[in-house]
Every structure is written in C-alpha cells, then in structure tokens.
Swiss-Prot record:
It comes from Acinetobacter baylyi (strain ATCC 33305 / BD413 / ADP1). This is GMP synthase [glutamine-hydrolyzing]. The active site is at C116 (nucleophile), H206, E208. It comes from the Bacteria. Homodimer. NCBIfam families: guaA_Cterm (TIGR00884), guaA_Nterm (TIGR00888), PRK00074.1 (NF000848). Its EC number is 6.3.5.2. Keywords: ATP-binding, Glutamine amidotransferase, GMP biosynthesis, Ligase, Nucleotide-binding, Purine biosynthesis. Residues 233-425 form the GMPS ATP-PPase domain. ATP binds at S260, G261, G262, V263, D264, S265, S266. GO terms for cellular component: cytosol.
Length: 550
C-alpha cells in the first residue's frame, strides 16, 4: 500500500515537472513567435529622419518596419500593424503630385501618428487645410501644451512647454473635423493636435531627433499607451528567435562567412556559431591594409577564444602588387574590391559541401536599396560584404541582421559576449588603409600610418575622448616636410589627424579635441616615428568635406 501511494505521488510529481517543462517551452516559443506580432508600420515620405523613427520605436521595445509612402493597400493590410506613423518629408502638399498617404491608413481603425509632413498630409486628406507659413521654423522651438491627450499628457519639459526640433515651412491652418489643439507655438497654432475618438494624432515637430526633449517618451506613449504594444523586442528575445530561424533555414548544411573584423560580420559570426557551431567556416582576408595587429586580434577573438573555424588568407603582397602605381581613389577602391572577391572565391572553392553564404547586411542597407514607385526613396548603394562573386559559386544567402539597425546589432553583440572594444569601435572603411593613404599605396606608407593611427587611438582612449567621437583616424600624406631634430634636419612625411562628431554620418563636424591632447598626440607621433616630421589636424566639417579623405 505504501509502495503504491509512493508511486502515485512520484507519478504526480513527474507530471507536474513535465507540465513545467512544457510551460517553459511554450513561453519560449510564444516569445520567439510573437516578438514581432506587436508591430508599427512607418510610411516614409522622404525625410532624412525617417530611419530615426523606426529606431526610436524599437528602442521602446516594439518591432517596426519602414516602407515607401506608396505601399499598396494589400501590403498594408497584410502587414497588420498595431499603429501607423507617417514620416516627415521635403515636399509641400501644395505641389502637384506631392505624396499622399494611402486612404486605407485612415480606414483600418488603428492609431495613426503624423509627423511634420505626415501631419500636414493627414490633415488635408481628412478635410483640414494647410498653407505656407509666413514664418518658417527650423531648429529649436518652445511648444506650449494647450491640452493634454494620451500622446503628450505626461510630458512636461518646463512648466507647460516642450523643447522640440522644428523643420517646416508649411503649416496646418485649419484642423479636420474632430481634431483639437494640444500644443502650439507663436507662429504655429497647431504644433500638435489629436482626434482621440479615432486615435489620430499629429505633431509639426520631430520627436524622433535627440534635439527634441521627451521625444522618445512621446513615441513610447504612442506605441504603448495608444497602440497597446508590449515590449518584447529585446536583444535576448531577438537572439532566441534568430537562433531558431537559422537552425530551421540551415539544417545540417555548411555556411561560409567573409569575416572582416567589423561589427556586422563579427556579430553574424557569433550568432551563427551559437546556432550551428562547427557548421560555420569563416574566411578572413588579410590584405595588408588593416590597422595595427588587427589580423591577430581577429584570429585570437574568433579562432582561439570562441573556437570558430577561421581561415586566414594572407594576401598582403597580392593587394599591394595590384595597387602599385594607382593614385585614383575610385580605382583603388575597385582594385581592392576585385582582389577581395577573387581571394575569397579561391578560398571558397577549396571547401567542399558549402551551401550557404552569410552576410552582414543590416536594415539601413535594405531601406537604401529599395526604390519607391514615385522616386522618393533613398539613393541605391552597394552594401553586400562580398557582392559580385563569380557565377560558379552558387550559394544561398543567410542574412540574420537584415532587419536590424546598427545600434541593435551592437546590443546583440554585447549580449552574445563580444568585447566592448570590438562592438563599439569606430567605423573602418572596406578598402581599409588603402583610402587613408593618399595617392599610391605602398607597404612603407601603410606601416607608418598603422603606427601613427595606433598612437592616436591610444591617446583618445586614455583621455576618454574615444567614445566622445564618432570616428577618428590618421591619414598618410604623400608629401615631405622639413623638420628639426636636435641639431639636425629631418625631411620626412606628413600625417593628418581626423576626428568627427556625428549621429548619422550624413553630416558631421570636426571634434573639438583639447589642444593639450592634440599636442600630446602630435609629439608622440613625431618622436616615436622617425619617418614623420609634421602632424596636422583636419578642421573640416561635412559638408562640404567628406569624413574620409578619399
């Protein structure tokens, strides 16, 4: 009897444990399956800030995607958004053929937020009026809160004012029926308005830019309070989902990845290794145009520490030979790209049974490669890490980052255990030092530049300025300058230092480094590198200058 009762109790306990396991699996599966079910659709009218909207929404823990304003009704319904955001844009609603939101946007029954031009076209399409403003507002403005709705109800920068970023000429002069004013400026009576019954909201300013105080909170109010979205879009959930998707897509097949040591390819490598382990092989092409000890660092991180199979192709002599005598920047880029593809292809042919090619394509690449039917989309750019591979290398693509922004990729890398120094290091161009050596590329020049750049980075990190600048690097000038060392004359090369501050790399200003720091960097470079006699600091902003010199 006792034995029977004991067995019965044990049986119940096993059932309970099994139910917990099943529940745990269910929770994981639910999380993985539904982290994109709460979703915001962003219709892009051509604003330079449109990608920022998508990033801010995702920072609030909600999945979002951005499409051109002329998205079809069928596609909008298929996307099944919890809410829709209409971006700003450079057009005027008074211009013939200016873009309009698809009418279905206002018929779906979901909340809509119009920003700047998005607010104007929404107002006009719903029966309001838009007219050219007598005073154009560009830059900071103080907005007075007139009435608190769900969008601005809990926002308060000063007593009743918000510091916002304006960028508009036209303005809404008459609201559609059902709308009421929630905020204004002296020259813009309808800086924000809403129709709470239909859950339509509009703001004339840009909440997505960092210059707008409480802008992130405003967008969070829209996606959480108004649209009812949760906050499941997190690095941990994204990794779980990607691992599951990669295993389903790849199965037992082999994957090849061109590893550059940059942020995107590094995160792809770590993610694939977590998902499929030894099925991944990376090819690292060392072209002799990398930063000091960069090749060894990449091998140590991925091959030694993480156990990833990495093939290092030492191709320095090959690249330098191909570049010999060439001084045109664009031709240098093409030569470097061509040689990289050929080296990568040669290594790929040595491997048997590889079915998939992994790439570090990220969401801005996808957005910028999409053309709108009415020509409002961004200019197409080439972005694939190993684009242009020979036809006889037939791979299926694996792009696990193609719906993620750069900041999301960095967060994934941190969560996956990659070091901060790798994830948050400054951008490095694909052609490497090949476009930071002006004119012809020679090994002598590359060796000098590597040392100078390393000293620059050492001092930026030691002073705390590395993380305050978006990008910094040294540039080799193929001219010599006279210097004095002791009682002797030195006739040696010139090094330029470049450091910039920027958020989006579309515009940038030169970093205002302390004179004492610039002095220390300059002194070290000239003292420690005998082939350098002069150091200059680049004080050009973008525009008109570009960030890179070539």
């Amino acid at each position: 009897m006792l034995i029977e009762r004991t067995c019965a109790i044990l049986g119940k306990m096993l059932e309970y444990c099994a139910s917990l396991v099943a529940l745990h699996s269910c929770v994981i599966m639910t999380t993985n399956t539904h982290i994109t079910d709460d979703r915001i659709l962003i219709l892009d009218f051509g604003s330079q800030y449109s990608q920022l909207i998508a990033r801010r929404v995702r920072e609030a823990g909600v999945y979002s995607e951005m499409y051109a304003f002329d998205m079809s009704e069928e596609d909008i319904r298929a996307f099944n958004p919890n809410g829709i955001i209409l971006s700003g844009g450079p057009e005027s609603v008074h211009e013939e053929g200016s873009p309009r939101a698809p009418q279905v946007v206002f018929e779906l029954g979901v909340p809509v937020l119009g920003i700047c031009y998005g607010f104007q076209t929404m107002s006009e399409q719903l029966g309001g009026k838009v007219e050219p403003g007598t005073v154009h507002e560009f830059g900071y403005a103080e907005v007075d809160i007139q009435q608190r709705d769900q969008l601005v109800g809990n926002l308060q920068d000063r007593e009743n004012q918000l510091h916002v970023w304006m960028s508009h000429g036209d303005k809404v002069s008459r609201l559609p029926e059902g709308f009421s004013t929630t905020a204004s400026t002296p020259s813009c009576p309808f800086a924000a308005a809403s129709d709470e019954a239909r859950r339509f909201y509009g703001v004339q300013f840009h909440p997505e830019v960092t210059h707008t105080a409480k802008g992130a909170e405003l967008l969070a109010n829209f996606v959480h309070k108004i649209c009812g979205c949760g906050g499941l879009w997190t690095p941990e959930h994204i990794i779980d989902l990607r691992v599951e998707q990669l295993r389903a897509q790849i199965g037992d097949e082999k994957v090849l990845l061109g590893l550059s040591g940059g942020v995107d390819s590094s995160v792809v490598a770590a993610l694939l290794h977590k998902a499929i382990g030894d099925q991944l092989t990376c090819v690292f092409v060392d072209n002799g145009l990398l930063r000091l000890n960069e090749g060894d660092q990449v091998m140590q991180m991925f091959a030694d520490n993480m156990g990833i199979r990495v093939i290092r192709a030492d191709a320095e002599e090959r690249f330098l030979t191909a570049l010999a005598g060439e001084v045109d920047p664009e031709k240098k880029r093409k030569i470097i790209g061509r040689e990289f593809i050929e080296v990568f292809a040669e290594e790929a042919r040595k491997l048997d049974g590889v079915k998939f090619l992994a790439q570090g394509t990220i969401y801005p690449d996808v957005i910028e490669s999409a053309a709108s039917k009415q020509g409002k989309a961004h200019v197409i750019k080439s972005h694939h890490n190993v684009g242009g591979l020979p036809d006889d290398l037939e791979f299926e693509l694996v792009e696990p980052l193609r719906d993620l922004f750069k900041d999301e990729v960095r967060k994934l890398g941190t969560t996956l255990g990659l070091p901060h120094s790798m994830i948050y290091r400054h951008p490095f161009p694909g052609p490497g030092l090949g476009v930071r050596i002006l004119g012809e590329v020679k090994k002598e020049y590359a060796d000098i530049l590597r040392l100078a750049d390393d000293i620059f980075m050492q001092e930026l990190r030691a002073s705390g300025w590395y993380d305050k600048t978006a990008q910094a690097f040294a540039v080799f000038q193929p001219v010599k300058s006279v210097g004095v060392v002791g009682d002797g004359r030195r006739y040696a090369w010139v090094i330029a230092l470049r450091a910039v501050e920027t958020v989006d790399f579309m515009t940038a200003r030169f970093a205002h480094l302390p004179y004492e720091l610039v002095d220390k960097i300059s002194t070290r470079i000239m003292n420690e590198i005998k082939d350098v006699s002069r150091v200059v600091y680049d004080v050009s902003s973008k525009p008109p200058a570009t960030i890179e010199w070539e």
